[in-house]
Amino acid sequence: VHWSAEEKQLITGLWGKVNVADCGAEALARLLIVYPWTQRFFASFGNLSSPTAILGNPMVRAHGKKVLTSFGDAVKNLDNIKNTFSQLSELHCDKLHVDPENFRLLGDILIIVLAAHFSKDFTPECQAAWQKLVRVVAHALARKYH
């Protein structure tokens, strides 16, 4: 994947403003609320019975932070995303059996969260760069699937 200097700047510039804990928690909570069938991968998280329960669930919050922290590795390694996510792809494929479509859904949710938090900075050009990034990350995570 080729990244222009402008794309890299738009991605890293916005990423520097992201509160990983808050945005990660919100993104994962939104995924579980908007696409309730994704909850089956999080049965060990306890109460996911309502939007209020999901938004207040500390395990959702912690895992959301973990997911977005890992997404930060993509931002730091834009030219090597495939290898950056190689082990996570294996884990999600072989051990967790996560439907790879969920990576795309989470990427789209992340775009919504970023737009909501950074409306002034989230220009159409910025959105295009981030949309490309979440697509590349989703593809890298789905790589180990047969």
UniProtKB/Swiss-Prot annotation:
One of its GO terms (cellular component) is hemoglobin complex. InterPro entries: Globin, Globin-like_sf, Globin/Proto, Hemoglobin_b, Hemoglobin_oxygen_transport. Keywords: Heme, Iron, Metal-binding, Oxygen transport, Transport. Heme b binds at residues 63, 92. GO terms for molecular function: haptoglobin binding; heme binding; metal ion binding; organic acid binding; oxygen binding; oxygen carrier activity; peroxidase activity. Red blood cells. Gene3D superfamilies: Globins. One of its GO terms (biological process) is hydrogen peroxide catabolic process. Residues 2-146 form the Globin domain. Belongs to the globin family. PANTHER family: HEMOGLOBIN FAMILY MEMBER, HEMOGLOBIN SUBUNIT EPSILON. Involved in oxygen transport from the lung to the various peripheral tissues. Heterotetramer of two alpha chains and two beta chains. This is Hemoglobin subunit beta. It comes from Phasianus colchicus colchicus. The lineage of its organism: Eukaryota, Metazoa, Chordata, Craniata, Vertebrata.
